[in-house]
Structures are given as C-alpha cells and as structure tokens.
Regions:
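Signal-transmission linkers at sensory-effector interfaces
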Residues: 1-27, 34, 148, 166-206
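GAF sensory/regulatory domain recognition
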Residues: 30, 42-74, 78-79
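Amphipathic alpha-helical "output/dimerization" segments
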Residues: 126, 144-165
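Short hydrophobic/glycine-rich mini-motifs in sensory/regulatory modules
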Residues: 124-134
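A short, aliphatic-rich beta-strand micro-motif
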Residues: 117-125
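Short beta-strand-to-loop transition segments that serve as allosteric relay/switch motifs
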Residues: 132-143
Length: 208
C-alpha cells in the first residue's frame, strides 16, 4: 500500500468512528515518522493563549521510546525567528538546527536535552488559512532534509486536512487561531495531492 493510501486509511478510520483522536494522532505521527525516516514526528496547531499566540502539540511520537511523549507549547513571543520563518516561508528546514537562525533559540531547553540535531517543520492549512504544522526531528546526528521530504509533509497535510481539523478541535482546551488571511501569499493548498508519482494510478486501479 502506498503512503497516500495509508494516510487515507488512517483518516478514514477516524471519520468512521473506528478510532478516537488519540489513536488517530498516534497512527498519523508514527506513519509520517516512517515516511520521512526521522527520530521524532509531531503535529502542532496554532492557538491563542493568555501568553499570546502559540503552537500546541497534539501528539509527538518518539521512535526511541516507541510511544507518544509530551511537548510544551511554543510561544511566538519566545520564538520570534522560528515563527517568522514558519509563517513567511511555510516551513523551517534546519538540517543543522543547533546553528540555524530560526532554531538556535531552542538549543539549551530543547535541542541539547533531547540530543536533537535537525528539525523540519512544515505548515498545513485549512480552507487556505495556516492551521498547524508537522515537525520532524532527528536525534544523534544531523540529517540533510530534502525537498522531497518537504513536499511529502505538504501532501500529507493536504490529504489529511479535514481529519486534522476534526481531531484537533475535539480537544476542549484547543481553540485554533486564525492567524493569517486566506489571501496570504504563503498559504498552502488543502486539496488532496498524491504522495507518490504512482499514487494516482493506484487510486484509479482500485477506486475503493
């Protein structure tokens, strides 16, 4: 089964009520970690808090522990360069996260304690408005992220956008923030797109 079909099946199980939101996020982050080949994978959503706008972690899968782990909110006020890059460019590609201008601020409190060397964060949108991001993290040694990996995360966000909205808004303390207008030039498309070159062909062969 192709990556695209796997993502569709995970979303379909949530839509049919066969899994709950926690199981959905667990399955999704594990699958994306396998697709990208990274140590950790998380799903975050933009929220408004008493301390200002932030990214809140819905789930963070850590391959080293083979389970979901906790992650603190990331606040715009504390992480200006990171937020600015993520919003303006739609992604943060930091193969050397310990020295990248957008992520060096995480060095002492996040990167060093978790032995993380590389970060790849890519926004996903709902109805044209940035809603959250996928984060991929590499521990032990640096990993040179590729454009293909960036595109894979964007396609996952496009394909899973409605399921992500459903799962994220099922959390009582999560009120998603509409941070930017749909006309923003860095908005991402939310229409489904193939993850692999042959994904569309497979769908045509098997319409179910």
């Amino acid at each position: 089964m192709s990556d695209g079909r796997i993502i569709q099946e995970i979303c379909g199980r949530l839509d049919r009520g066969e899994t709950d939101r926690d199981q959905f996020f667990d399955q999704l982050t594990r699958t994306v970690a396998d697709m990208i080949g990274c140590t950790r994978c998380g799903v975050w959503v933009f929220v408004d808090t008493a301390e200002g706008r932030a990214l809140r972690c819905m789930a963070m899968y850590d391959r080293r522990l083979d389970r979901i782990v906790g992650a603190a909110d990331i606040y715009n006020a504390d992480s200006g360069p990171y937020f600015e890059t993520l919003v303006q460019e739609g992604c943060v590609v930091a193969s050397d996260a310990r020295h990248h201008p957008a992520t060096v601020g995480f060095l002492d409190n996040y990167l060093l304690p978790l032995d993380l060397h590389s970060l790849l964060d890519v926004c996903f949108s709902i109805n044209g408005v940035p809603f959250g991001s996928f984060s991929c993290e590499q521990a032990g040694a640096a990993l040179n992220w590729t454009q293909r990996q960036v595109q894979m995360l964007r396609h996952v966000g496009s394909r899973a956008s409605l399921a992500l909205l459903h799962a994220a808004t099922a959390t009582p303390d999560t009120q998603p923030a509409a941070l930017w207008e749909p006309s923003s030039p860095n908005r991402l498309l939310t229409m489904p797109a193939p993850l692999d070159p042959d994904d569309e062909n497979e769908r045509r062969r098997d319409p179910t």
